Amino acid sequence: MAGLEVLFASAAPSMSCPQDALVCFLHWEVVTNGYYALGTGDQPGPSDKKSELLPAKWNSNKELYALRYESKDGARKLLLKAVSVENGMIINVLELGTQQVADLTLNLDDYIDAEDLSDFHRTYKNSEELRSQIRSGIITPIHEQWEKARANSPPREFPPATAREVDPLQISSHRPHTSRQPAWRDPLSPFAVGGDDLDPFGCQRGGMIVDPLRSGFPRVLIDPSSGLPNRLPPGAVPPGARFDPFGPIGTSPSGPNPDHLPPPGYDDMYL
């Protein structure tokens, strides 16, 4: 039982009853199983600190001992209370995170010799049995219940995306892949007209529809609005688009010439 005698020596000057000796042994067993003492009372205090020794004023109340512990990995916190009842003690331990409880009742006469509390070798008797009682009644149940609660806990949920991460008004930087129109290459020869119809895979050569702007002959500026009473809005005819003129090429957009006299023989059906 390494460490118990050293702990007893540090606490012996303040021991005055069998209950003190039993709580000292209980504290040693809890620390041996991977805990630090934090302080006394139900609530944390400004004087709390992690230590393997008993905290100050740990036995100021002989009727009710209240000690708080924290596991070395910080995962579990215990609240231990020992209540004096006639010639025995009722020990209750609460795991603060899961609210799991374990309790144990011990008879003082079975484990403590009250005749000389200053002598370590005479104070405790049946030490192995006492240690087994504490482990099976408190330490093991608390650990098993904590592990079970941890295994049954729901998986961690990630918070939803913030407004900064998802903005419906923000233009996405990822543009969908769209098919692009093949670049129009001017034929180098007027005889290239219709070449695309001979190639089933299409090599971007001219088809049977002749574009007057891309026929290979000297180009003549054509007004797309020819034959219309008003001009087309900008962008109505994309550059390089194939189209049929709306009217005779070269007419004025203001309309035909105002002829006041009918043409000769307009009323002769046999003419």
Curated annotation (Swiss-Prot):
- State the residue spans of region: Disordered: 226-271
Which UniProt key words apply to this protein? Acetylation, Cytoplasm, Endoplasmic reticulum, Methylation, Phosphoprotein, Proteasome
Q: Does the keyword Cytoplasm apply?
A: yes
Q: Where is this region: Important for homodimerization and interaction with FBXO7?
A: 2-150
Domain of life, per UniProt, equals: Eukaryota
Q: Which InterPro entries match?
A: PI31-like, PI31_Prot_C, PI31_Prot_N
Which residue positions does Phosphoserine occur at?
Answer: S153, S189, S252
> Any idea where this protein resides?
Cytoplasm; Endoplasmic reticulum
- The annotated regions of Pro residues compositional bias extend over 255-265
Q: What GO biological process terms are annotated to this protein in UniProt?
A: negative regulation of proteasomal protein catabolic process; proteasome-mediated ubiquitin-dependent protein catabolic process; ubiquitin-dependent protein catabolic process
Q: Which residues carry this modification: N-acetylalanine?
A: A2
Positions where Asymmetric dimethylarginine occurs in the chain: R219
Q: Name one GO molecular function term.
A: endopeptidase inhibitor activity
| Pfam families to which the protein is assigned, alphabetical | PI31_Prot_C, PI31_Prot_N
Q: Omega-N-methylarginine: which positions carry it?
A: R205, R231
- One GO CC term on file: proteasome complex
Q: Which PANTHER family match?
A: PROTEASOME INHIBITOR (PTHR13266), PROTEASOME INHIBITOR PI31 SUBUNIT (PTHR13266:SF1)
Q: What does this protein do?
A: Plays an important role in control of proteasome function. Inhibits the hydrolysis of protein and peptide substrates by the 20S proteasome. Also inhibits the activation of the proteasome by the proteasome regulatory proteins PA700 and PA28.
Listed under subunit, the entry gives: Monomer and homodimer. Interacts with FBXO7.
User: Which family, according to the similarity comment?
Assistant: Belongs to the proteasome inhibitor PI31 family.
**Would you tell me the protein name for this molecule?**
Proteasome inhibitor PI31 subunit
